[in-house]
Amino acid sequence: MALFFRLGLAGPLLLLTVRPSSAETLYNQPPFSEKELNQFIADLPRFRAWIKTNKEKAHPIVNEAGEPDFLYSENAAGYIKAAGWKPERFFCIMGRAAAAVAIIQQGDAITKEPPVEMPNVSDDELDVVRRNLPGLLKAISPTPTPKK
């Protein structure tokens, strides 16, 4: 799941306010649409910048039930709400889109033995990500640090 690390969102937790999302609401949602993915692509760079500036964390985990889940702080949830999202939906799309990119890039190598934190991705979601792959990759690529 190197892609999650490319998102710049993985790492050890720094704050005790970070909590796992509810497994009943995070990945037990309908597949995302192309419109939702495009909005996610538009909002992700600002969220990544906010995460970095505020030293927050948001990343996939395996919950107590052994299922893929997502860990994010109340502050991150508040930022996402202010951007017009339901946090559970934003982080669901984040996890599924990252998993779809991993499937596209690694194919059978990852689908035969997926990492335990990797959520299931529907065929429709995989197709939507394929159609929007250049924009998604641009949104998740690390921003180069300006040289002084």
Please give the residue ranges for each predicted region:
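Immediate post-signal-peptide N-terminus of mature secreted/exported proteins
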Residues: A23-E64, G135-K148
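Bacterial N-terminal signal peptides that target proteins for export
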Residues: M1-G8
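Hydrophobic helical h-region of N-terminal Sec-dependent signal peptides
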Residues: L9-L14
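Compact alpha-helical subdomains of small soluble proteins
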Residues: V62-K147
